[in-house]
Amino acid sequence: DKNAFEWTTLNLNANMKDLDGSEKMYLELKGLGAFAQFKLKDGGIVESEYDSVNKVWTIKDIAYDKINDIQFTNDKDTTVDIKAWTTDGIDSTREKPATGFMEVDFAKNAVENGKFTLGKEVNIDFSKIVNGDIQGVNKIDLSAEGENKLLNLTLEDVLSIGTKDVKGNINLTILGDSDDKVTFKNEIGKEWSSNVVNDDKGNKLYTEWSNTTGDTTVTVKVEQPISDGITN
């Protein structure tokens, strides 16, 4: 069984079998979060766009013979409502799309007991998502095999996903190895500062990134040797 934020194949319901085989296919997926990602099984790029108002993903320009090769990630169990249509550049079946659904039932959700775990070769670019889908996090684990990236992490992102301690501050720890990467993004008046610290037992080194807003101090400890720094 797959866990949340691991690559999972998009299985289309059987009542979508009558699609006519035109050159390109489009999908609308409702039920996946803003953190969802898409790719083909062979690593090919899937062009996708998220409508944050209607909470719908649109997947574009998929070759008909690749429709069953689409993989996705999501943070938790859900039902995905699917609409599919074809276009050859002139004619389109969008007005009468095929419809279906997929039940997504993960063995483990992405966030459990405050720990947010990413699967193999899953990346999150915070500049491309809407805050609010992931909450209550105090630890992010990037240690799955392969490269995992957290990109463009702002103060607002950490405020959104983190949980406050009794003093009203947020402490987040990011675990991983040399294959992984974390980048922070400065904003006017909200710049990150960093220094190197040990854990409580003196066994591990971390780069500790700090930022402040009002009475809240945000601290993000990134395990070395994760590659980390400020986005240009």
Language model: regions and residue ranges:
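Short, T/G/N/S-enriched strand-turn elements that build extracellular solenoid repeat scaffolds
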Residues: 110, 122-134, 138, 148-166, ...
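Low-complexity acidic/polar repeat-biased segments
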Residues: 180-232
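Right-handed beta-helix
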Residues: 114-120
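Surface-exposed beta-strand/loop patches in extracellular or lumenal glycoproteins
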Residues: 25-30, 124, 173-177, 182
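Extracellular glycosylation-rich, acidic/polar low-complexity regions of adhesion-
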Residues: 1-112, 161-170, 206, 217, ...
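Discrete beta-strand positions within long extracellular beta-solenoid architectures
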Residues: 115, 136-139, 173
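Acidic glycine-/aspartate-rich tracts in secreted/extracellular proteins
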Residues: 34-35, 145-148, 178-181
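Feature marks extracellular polysaccharide-active and adherence modules
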Residues: 119, 141-143, 175-177
